[in-house]
A protein has these predicted regions:
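Short coil/turn segments that connect the beta-strands within blades of beta-propeller domains
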Residues: 45-47, 89-91, 147-149, 189-191, ...
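Short loop/turn segments that connect beta-strands within beta-propeller blades
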Residues: 66-69, 117-119, 166-170, 207-210, ...
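Short glycine/acidic-enriched loop and turn motifs that connect beta-strands
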Residues: 54-58, 99-104, 158-159, 199-202, ...
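Loop/turn-rich, solvent-exposed surfaces of beta-rich toroidal or solenoidal domains
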Residues: 277-320, 326-343, 347-348
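Repeated scaffold domains used in trafficking and secretory/extracellular systems
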Residues: 31-40, 78-89, 133-143, 178-190, ...
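Asp-box/WD-like beta-propeller blade repeats and closely related beta-sheet repeat scaffolds
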Residues: 120-162, 169-185
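Short, conserved, GDST-rich strand-edge loop motifs in beta-rich repeat architectures
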Residues: 42-54, 95-109, 295-310
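A short beta-strand motif characteristic of beta-propeller blades
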Residues: 27-34, 68-76, 80-82, 121-133, ...
Protein backbone atom coordinates (compact mmCIF):
# COMPACT_ATOMS: atom_id res chain seq x y z
CA UNK A 1 0.00 0.00 0.00
CA UNK A 2 2.85 2.37 0.85
CA UNK A 3 4.52 1.61 -2.46
CA UNK A 4 1.36 2.39 -4.43
CA UNK A 5 0.87 5.66 -2.55
CA UNK A 6 4.48 6.71 -3.23
CA UNK A 7 4.07 6.10 -6.97
CA UNK A 8 0.82 8.04 -7.00
CA UNK A 9 2.37 11.01 -5.19
CA UNK A 10 5.36 11.07 -7.58
CA UNK A 11 3.04 10.99 -10.58
CA UNK A 12 1.02 13.84 -9.14
CA UNK A 13 4.18 15.89 -8.57
CA UNK A 14 5.33 15.32 -12.15
CA UNK A 15 1.96 16.34 -13.57
CA UNK A 16 1.92 19.42 -11.40
CA UNK A 17 5.42 20.46 -12.41
CA UNK A 18 4.61 19.90 -16.08
CA UNK A 19 1.55 22.09 -15.72
CA UNK A 20 3.61 24.86 -14.11
CA UNK A 21 6.24 24.67 -16.87
CA UNK A 22 3.56 24.67 -19.56
CA UNK A 23 1.89 27.65 -17.91
CA UNK A 24 5.18 29.55 -17.71
CA UNK A 25 5.97 28.86 -21.34
CA UNK A 26 2.52 29.95 -22.35
CA UNK A 27 3.04 33.29 -20.63
CA UNK A 28 6.49 33.98 -22.10
CA UNK A 29 6.37 32.63 -25.69
CA UNK A 30 3.86 32.03 -28.42
CA UNK A 31 4.02 28.75 -30.34
CA UNK A 32 4.98 29.32 -33.97
CA UNK A 33 4.47 26.29 -36.24
CA UNK A 34 7.37 25.42 -38.53
CA UNK A 35 6.85 26.25 -42.18
CA UNK A 36 8.00 23.54 -44.57
CA UNK A 37 9.12 24.72 -47.99
CA UNK A 38 11.00 23.46 -51.03
CA UNK A 39 13.57 25.16 -53.23
CA UNK A 40 12.31 26.15 -56.66
CA UNK A 41 15.63 25.25 -58.27
CA UNK A 42 18.67 23.19 -57.34
CA UNK A 43 21.91 24.93 -56.51
CA UNK A 44 23.91 25.60 -59.71
CA UNK A 45 27.01 23.65 -60.63
CA UNK A 46 27.97 20.34 -62.25
CA UNK A 47 26.12 17.20 -61.20
CA UNK A 48 26.64 13.46 -60.93
CA UNK A 49 23.58 11.39 -61.89
CA UNK A 50 23.02 7.93 -60.36
CA UNK A 51 20.17 5.65 -61.47
CA UNK A 52 18.80 3.62 -58.54
CA UNK A 53 16.78 0.65 -59.77
CA UNK A 54 14.31 -0.84 -57.31
CA UNK A 55 14.43 -4.59 -57.80
CA UNK A 56 12.29 -5.18 -54.71
CA UNK A 57 9.30 -3.47 -56.34
CA UNK A 58 8.23 0.14 -56.13
CA UNK A 59 9.68 3.29 -57.64
CA UNK A 60 13.15 3.71 -59.08
CA UNK A 61 14.88 7.09 -58.84
CA UNK A 62 17.68 9.14 -60.37
CA UNK A 63 19.66 11.01 -57.72
CA UNK A 64 21.51 14.25 -58.45
CA UNK A 65 24.74 14.81 -56.50
CA UNK A 66 27.10 17.76 -56.49
CA UNK A 67 30.11 16.86 -58.62
CA UNK A 68 32.27 18.77 -56.13
CA UNK A 69 31.55 16.97 -52.84
CA UNK A 70 28.68 14.53 -53.60
CA UNK A 71 26.15 16.52 -51.60
CA UNK A 72 22.67 15.29 -52.55
CA UNK A 73 20.99 18.09 -54.51
CA UNK A 74 17.78 16.53 -55.81
CA UNK A 75 16.08 13.52 -57.40
CA UNK A 76 13.32 12.37 -59.73
CA UNK A 77 11.43 9.08 -59.58
CA UNK A 78 9.64 6.72 -61.93
CA UNK A 79 8.44 3.13 -61.96
CA UNK A 80 10.27 -0.17 -61.53
CA UNK A 81 13.56 -1.28 -63.13
CA UNK A 82 14.40 2.06 -64.70
CA UNK A 83 16.86 2.97 -67.47
CA UNK A 84 18.02 6.55 -67.92
CA UNK A 85 19.79 8.98 -70.22
CA UNK A 86 20.89 12.58 -69.71
CA UNK A 87 21.03 15.39 -72.27
CA UNK A 88 24.45 16.78 -73.20
CA UNK A 89 23.82 20.01 -71.29
CA UNK A 90 22.75 18.09 -68.18
CA UNK A 91 19.39 19.85 -67.95
CA UNK A 92 17.10 16.96 -68.98
CA UNK A 93 16.77 13.40 -67.68
CA UNK A 94 14.99 10.72 -69.73
CA UNK A 95 13.68 7.89 -67.54
CA UNK A 96 12.06 4.70 -68.88
CA UNK A 97 10.48 2.30 -66.39
CA UNK A 98 7.55 -0.04 -65.71
CA UNK A 99 4.37 0.68 -63.75
CA UNK A 100 2.64 -2.52 -62.60
CA UNK A 101 -0.62 -3.32 -60.85
CA UNK A 102 1.16 -5.33 -58.14
CA UNK A 103 4.32 -3.20 -57.86
CA UNK A 104 6.65 -5.68 -59.55
CA UNK A 105 4.21 -7.91 -61.43
CA UNK A 106 0.76 -8.00 -62.99
CA UNK A 107 -0.62 -5.84 -65.76
CA UNK A 108 1.11 -2.58 -66.46
CA UNK A 109 2.66 -0.17 -68.91
CA UNK A 110 6.08 1.12 -69.84
CA UNK A 111 6.50 4.88 -69.79
CA UNK A 112 9.11 7.42 -70.86
CA UNK A 113 9.23 10.33 -68.41
CA UNK A 114 11.12 13.50 -69.27
CA UNK A 115 12.31 15.61 -66.32
CA UNK A 116 13.72 19.11 -65.97
CA UNK A 117 16.87 18.73 -63.86
CA UNK A 118 17.21 22.24 -62.33
CA UNK A 119 13.66 22.12 -60.92
CA UNK A 120 13.34 18.30 -60.50
CA UNK A 121 9.95 18.50 -62.23
CA UNK A 122 8.21 16.26 -64.75
CA UNK A 123 7.84 17.90 -68.17
CA UNK A 124 6.00 15.19 -70.09
CA UNK A 125 5.27 11.47 -70.34
CA UNK A 126 5.10 9.20 -73.39
CA UNK A 127 3.58 5.72 -73.13
CA UNK A 128 5.79 3.15 -74.86
CA UNK A 129 5.04 -0.30 -76.28
CA UNK A 130 4.87 -2.76 -73.38
CA UNK A 131 8.16 -4.38 -74.42
CA UNK A 132 10.96 -2.50 -72.63
CA UNK A 133 13.72 -4.76 -71.35
CA UNK A 134 13.52 -5.08 -67.57
CA UNK A 135 17.19 -5.78 -66.97
CA UNK A 136 20.01 -4.49 -64.79
CA UNK A 137 20.58 -0.97 -66.06
CA UNK A 138 23.21 -0.21 -68.67
CA UNK A 139 23.63 2.96 -70.71
CA UNK A 140 23.31 0.82 -73.85
CA UNK A 141 19.63 0.21 -73.10
CA UNK A 142 18.51 3.83 -73.56
CA UNK A 143 20.33 6.21 -75.90
CA UNK A 144 19.82 9.58 -77.59
CA UNK A 145 20.59 10.24 -81.25
CA UNK A 146 23.56 12.50 -81.97
CA UNK A 147 21.37 15.63 -82.20
CA UNK A 148 19.05 14.45 -79.38
CA UNK A 149 15.98 14.44 -81.60
CA UNK A 150 15.32 10.71 -81.23
CA UNK A 151 15.46 8.42 -78.22
CA UNK A 152 16.24 4.73 -78.78
CA UNK A 153 14.74 2.24 -76.28
CA UNK A 154 15.88 -1.39 -75.97
CA UNK A 155 13.06 -3.95 -75.97
CA UNK A 156 13.07 -7.64 -75.01
CA UNK A 157 9.93 -9.80 -74.86
CA UNK A 158 12.28 -11.86 -75.09
CA UNK A 159 12.37 -11.07 -78.84
CA UNK A 160 14.62 -8.02 -79.20
CA UNK A 161 13.80 -4.76 -80.94
CA UNK A 162 14.32 -1.01 -80.51
CA UNK A 163 11.55 1.55 -80.08
CA UNK A 164 12.31 4.89 -81.77
CA UNK A 165 10.77 7.94 -80.06
CA UNK A 166 10.60 11.30 -81.85
CA UNK A 167 11.17 13.76 -78.98
CA UNK A 168 10.10 16.75 -81.09
CA UNK A 169 6.73 15.17 -81.86
CA UNK A 170 6.45 13.46 -78.49
CA UNK A 171 5.49 10.11 -79.98
CA UNK A 172 6.74 6.66 -80.96
CA UNK A 173 7.55 6.57 -84.70
CA UNK A 174 8.64 2.96 -85.22
CA UNK A 175 9.84 -0.30 -83.73
CA UNK A 176 12.98 -1.73 -85.35
CA UNK A 177 13.27 -5.55 -85.09
CA UNK A 178 16.75 -6.76 -84.17
CA UNK A 179 16.49 -10.52 -83.54
CA UNK A 180 19.45 -11.97 -81.69
CA UNK A 181 21.03 -8.56 -81.09
CA UNK A 182 21.12 -6.36 -77.99
CA UNK A 183 22.44 -2.95 -76.91
CA UNK A 184 22.25 0.46 -78.61
CA UNK A 185 25.34 2.39 -79.82
CA UNK A 186 24.24 5.53 -81.74
CA UNK A 187 26.15 6.81 -84.74
CA UNK A 188 28.01 10.09 -84.32
CA UNK A 189 26.20 11.62 -87.29
CA UNK A 190 22.68 11.28 -88.62
CA UNK A 191 20.18 8.81 -87.26
CA UNK A 192 21.15 5.25 -86.58
CA UNK A 193 22.87 2.87 -84.20
CA UNK A 194 24.75 -0.40 -84.03
CA UNK A 195 23.90 -3.38 -81.84
CA UNK A 196 25.79 -6.46 -80.59
CA UNK A 197 24.64 -9.79 -82.04
CA UNK A 198 24.85 -13.22 -80.45
CA UNK A 199 27.19 -14.60 -83.11
CA UNK A 200 29.91 -12.04 -82.34
CA UNK A 201 29.01 -9.64 -85.15
CA UNK A 202 27.38 -6.19 -85.02
CA UNK A 203 24.41 -4.96 -87.04
CA UNK A 204 24.18 -1.26 -87.92
CA UNK A 205 20.75 0.30 -88.52
CA UNK A 206 20.53 3.53 -90.53
CA UNK A 207 17.26 5.43 -90.03
CA UNK A 208 15.50 7.82 -92.39
CA UNK A 209 15.30 11.53 -91.59
CA UNK A 210 11.88 11.17 -89.98
CA UNK A 211 12.84 8.02 -88.09
CA UNK A 212 10.12 5.89 -89.68
CA UNK A 213 12.28 3.78 -92.03
CA UNK A 214 15.55 1.90 -91.71
CA UNK A 215 18.22 -0.06 -93.56
CA UNK A 216 20.62 -2.50 -91.92
CA UNK A 217 24.06 -3.92 -92.58
CA UNK A 218 25.77 -6.69 -90.63
CA UNK A 219 29.50 -6.80 -89.89
CA UNK A 220 31.95 -9.65 -90.00
CA UNK A 221 32.50 -11.50 -86.72
CA UNK A 222 34.17 -9.10 -84.27
CA UNK A 223 34.57 -11.21 -81.12
CA UNK A 224 33.99 -14.77 -79.92
CA UNK A 225 30.95 -14.76 -77.60
CA UNK A 226 31.98 -18.12 -76.10
CA UNK A 227 35.67 -17.58 -75.40
CA UNK A 228 35.82 -13.79 -74.98
CA UNK A 229 32.37 -12.20 -74.43
CA UNK A 230 32.19 -8.42 -74.25
CA UNK A 231 30.22 -6.19 -71.90
CA UNK A 232 27.32 -4.02 -73.03
CA UNK A 233 29.17 -1.00 -71.61
CA UNK A 234 31.06 1.15 -74.12
CA UNK A 235 32.62 4.55 -74.70
CA UNK A 236 34.04 6.56 -77.60
CA UNK A 237 37.76 7.21 -78.21
CA UNK A 238 38.53 9.65 -81.02
CA UNK A 239 35.36 8.55 -82.78
CA UNK A 240 35.90 4.82 -82.33
CA UNK A 241 33.79 2.55 -80.14
CA UNK A 242 35.52 0.93 -77.16
CA UNK A 243 34.35 -2.33 -75.61
CA UNK A 244 36.02 -4.47 -72.95
CA UNK A 245 35.66 -8.23 -72.65
CA UNK A 246 35.22 -10.27 -69.48
CA UNK A 247 38.91 -11.20 -69.82
CA UNK A 248 40.06 -7.54 -69.98
CA UNK A 249 40.66 -7.35 -73.72
CA UNK A 250 39.94 -3.92 -75.24
CA UNK A 251 38.07 -4.04 -78.56
CA UNK A 252 38.43 -0.86 -80.59
CA UNK A 253 35.85 -0.64 -83.40
CA UNK A 254 34.97 1.82 -86.16
CA UNK A 255 31.40 2.46 -87.31
CA UNK A 256 32.22 5.35 -89.66
CA UNK A 257 31.26 3.61 -92.91
CA UNK A 258 27.83 2.36 -91.91
CA UNK A 259 29.13 -1.01 -90.76
CA UNK A 260 31.24 -1.94 -87.72
CA UNK A 261 34.86 -2.92 -88.38
CA UNK A 262 37.59 -4.05 -86.01
CA UNK A 263 40.44 -1.58 -85.46
CA UNK A 264 42.41 -3.39 -82.75
CA UNK A 265 42.20 -5.84 -79.85
CA UNK A 266 44.45 -5.13 -76.87
CA UNK A 267 44.93 -7.49 -73.89
CA UNK A 268 45.23 -5.23 -70.83
CA UNK A 269 45.99 -7.94 -68.26
CA UNK A 270 48.57 -9.85 -70.30
CA UNK A 271 51.64 -10.58 -68.16
CA UNK A 272 50.01 -9.40 -64.92
CA UNK A 273 50.03 -11.99 -62.13
CA UNK A 274 46.85 -12.82 -60.24
CA UNK A 275 44.44 -13.85 -63.03
CA UNK A 276 42.93 -10.37 -63.25
CA UNK A 277 39.70 -9.73 -65.13
CA UNK A 278 37.14 -7.00 -65.67
CA UNK A 279 34.56 -6.62 -62.87
CA UNK A 280 31.29 -4.72 -62.68
CA UNK A 281 28.62 -3.44 -65.06
CA UNK A 282 29.68 0.05 -66.23
CA UNK A 283 33.27 -0.94 -66.94
CA UNK A 284 34.42 1.36 -69.77
CA UNK A 285 35.40 4.94 -68.85
CA UNK A 286 37.53 6.89 -71.34
CA UNK A 287 39.21 10.25 -70.71
CA UNK A 288 39.43 12.09 -74.02
CA UNK A 289 41.98 14.75 -73.06
CA UNK A 290 44.66 12.21 -72.13
CA UNK A 291 43.62 9.21 -74.26
CA UNK A 292 43.45 7.10 -71.09
CA UNK A 293 41.00 4.28 -70.46
CA UNK A 294 39.88 3.43 -66.91
CA UNK A 295 38.60 -0.10 -66.21
CA UNK A 296 37.45 -1.69 -62.91
CA UNK A 297 39.29 -4.96 -62.23
CA UNK A 298 39.43 -7.86 -59.76
CA UNK A 299 41.82 -10.77 -59.19
CA UNK A 300 41.00 -14.49 -59.38
CA UNK A 301 38.79 -13.94 -62.41
CA UNK A 302 36.52 -16.87 -63.34
CA UNK A 303 33.24 -17.62 -65.10
CA UNK A 304 30.49 -15.74 -63.29
CA UNK A 305 32.73 -13.19 -61.57
CA UNK A 306 32.39 -10.56 -64.29
CA UNK A 307 29.73 -8.55 -62.43
CA UNK A 308 31.37 -8.67 -58.98
CA UNK A 309 32.70 -5.53 -57.32
CA UNK A 310 36.13 -4.32 -58.42
CA UNK A 311 39.04 -3.96 -56.01
CA UNK A 312 41.19 -1.90 -58.39
CA UNK A 313 40.77 0.57 -61.23
CA UNK A 314 43.39 0.35 -63.96
CA UNK A 315 44.49 3.36 -65.98
CA UNK A 316 45.54 2.27 -69.47
CA UNK A 317 47.34 4.26 -72.19
CA UNK A 318 45.54 3.35 -75.42
CA UNK A 319 48.06 4.88 -77.83
CA UNK A 320 51.12 3.19 -76.31
CA UNK A 321 49.21 0.12 -75.13
CA UNK A 322 50.66 0.43 -71.64
CA UNK A 323 49.25 -0.11 -68.16
CA UNK A 324 49.89 3.16 -66.33
CA UNK A 325 48.64 2.58 -62.80
CA UNK A 326 46.57 0.24 -60.61
CA UNK A 327 44.58 2.04 -57.89
CA UNK A 328 42.76 0.45 -54.96
CA UNK A 329 39.02 1.21 -54.92
CA UNK A 330 35.91 0.44 -52.88
CA UNK A 331 34.20 -2.67 -54.32
CA UNK A 332 32.97 -0.73 -57.37
CA UNK A 333 30.38 -2.07 -59.82
CA UNK A 334 30.36 0.93 -62.15
CA UNK A 335 32.61 3.87 -62.99
CA UNK A 336 32.49 7.13 -64.95
CA UNK A 337 35.31 9.58 -65.72
CA UNK A 338 35.17 13.21 -66.84
CA UNK A 339 36.88 14.41 -70.03
CA UNK A 340 39.09 17.21 -68.69
CA UNK A 341 42.89 17.35 -68.66
CA UNK A 342 42.73 16.70 -64.91
CA UNK A 343 39.85 14.23 -64.78
CA UNK A 344 37.65 13.09 -61.91
CA UNK A 345 36.49 9.50 -61.59
CA UNK A 346 33.18 8.55 -59.97
CA UNK A 347 32.05 5.08 -58.94
CA UNK A 348 29.12 3.19 -57.44
CA UNK A 349 29.13 0.13 -55.19
CA UNK A 350 26.14 -2.20 -54.88
CA UNK A 351 27.66 -3.82 -51.80
CA UNK A 352 27.88 -0.62 -49.76
CA UNK A 353 25.10 1.33 -51.55
CA UNK A 354 27.46 4.27 -51.99
CA UNK A 355 28.69 6.62 -54.68
CA UNK A 356 32.36 7.66 -54.60
CA UNK A 357 34.45 10.51 -55.97
CA UNK A 358 38.12 9.91 -56.81
CA UNK A 359 40.67 12.55 -57.73
CA UNK A 360 42.89 11.54 -60.65
CA UNK A 361 46.54 12.63 -60.72
CA UNK A 362 47.97 12.83 -64.27
CA UNK A 363 51.43 13.50 -62.82
CA UNK A 364 51.27 10.16 -60.96
CA UNK A 365 50.42 8.06 -64.02
CA UNK A 366 46.69 8.64 -63.47
CA UNK A 367 46.48 7.16 -60.00
CA UNK A 368 43.12 7.74 -58.31
CA UNK A 369 42.54 8.75 -54.68
CA UNK A 370 39.19 8.80 -52.86
CA UNK A 371 37.99 12.34 -52.17
CA UNK A 372 34.35 11.88 -51.10
CA UNK A 373 31.60 9.30 -50.62
CA UNK A 374 27.84 9.41 -50.14
CA UNK A 375 24.90 7.02 -49.84
CA UNK A 376 23.18 6.18 -53.16
CA UNK A 377 20.10 4.61 -51.51
CA UNK A 378 19.97 1.29 -53.35
CA UNK A 379 20.89 -0.89 -56.32
CA UNK A 380 22.80 1.25 -58.84
CA UNK A 381 25.01 0.20 -61.75
CA UNK A 382 25.05 3.31 -63.97
CA UNK A 383 26.12 6.89 -63.46
CA UNK A 384 27.18 9.90 -65.49
CA UNK A 385 28.01 13.58 -65.00
CA UNK A 386 27.13 16.93 -66.54
CA UNK A 387 29.11 20.09 -67.30
Amino acid sequence: MAHKLSVALCAACLIGNAALVGSALGEDTEFVPETVSTKERMDPGPNVFVNMQNWRGGPSAVYFYSADDLTLKGSVSGGAQSHFAVSKDGNTVYLVSGFYSRLASGSGEHVLQIFDVPTNTLKTEIVLPFKVTQYTDDKALLQLSADERFLYVQNATPATSVTVVDLEKGSVVQEVPSPGCFGIYPTLEGYGYSTICNDGAFTTYSLGEDGTTFESQKSDKIFDPDSDPIYLASDRAKGDLLFVSYHANVYRLSDRDGVVKSVSVTPMAEGVEGNWGTSGYSVVAYNDANDVLFVPMAADHHDGSHYHGATEVWAYDLENKALLYRSNVDDLNGIHVTDGAVPTLYGVSIGSSKVFKYEVDPAARFAVKKAAEQSDFGFATTLTSSP
